[in-house]
Amino acid sequence: HPLHKKTETENKFTAYAADMTIALAYYKCMDDWKDEKKYLKRLYAESIKKQYQEVAEKYPRQCKAISESIRELEQIENSTADAKPDEAVKCSGKMLSELFVYEEDFWSNSLRSFGFELGQFIYLMDASMDYKEDIRKHNYNPLIGMNKKPEEMKEILTMCIGNVTQIFEKLPLVQDQHLLRNILYGGVWQKYSEKMQRKEKKHG
């Protein structure tokens, strides 16, 4: 409500998260424009270009990680015949590993490991969700190289998120720990579970 007082948590970490969101949005829009010529994405990228440039000046390491990972992924995905799924998965992990490190400190290695494992999980989960559309559009999908279908990915995805939660439980988190647990132990599975349930009903 506009007349009620609100408690907002704003600090250097929330500002950092907002900056990384801008950087990721910029590269995602430019990638969509390059791959599928989505003109609206190009316009949006242009509208946030100045903000992105400011972010890149503040966080060159992170923005370099995003651009290099996208370029590497593009090379992997375009070399369809020789594309190795594990390389694409690791590439996504490497990108997120750098974004999870705001600054170098005692916990940097743990945060890099957390980001790396989470990045791999997200990439494989997205691939599972996009499998049917990717085949229809003849897009690269690592599941094809793995000879797996989405419904056969549960064990691999469980192992990936298990690696994530193992590192998560060792981090010195105090605030909103229960919310993060809810996401990592349940929320990340919501769309996948719904998709599998719909498929079972359809073929059941």
Regions found by a protein language model. Give the residues of each.
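Short, charged, amphipathic alpha-helical segments
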Residues: 41-46, 112, 178-182
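Amphipathic alpha-helical protein-interaction segments
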Residues: 14-34, 40, 44-58, 95-96
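Divalent-cation-assisted or electrostatically stabilized phosphate/pyrophosphate-binding catalytic cores
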Residues: 1-20, 49-91, 109-113, 134-172, ...
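C-terminal domain/tail detector
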Residues: 166-203
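Inter-helical turn/loop segments and adjacent helix faces that build the functional surface
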Residues: 32-40, 102-109, 171-175
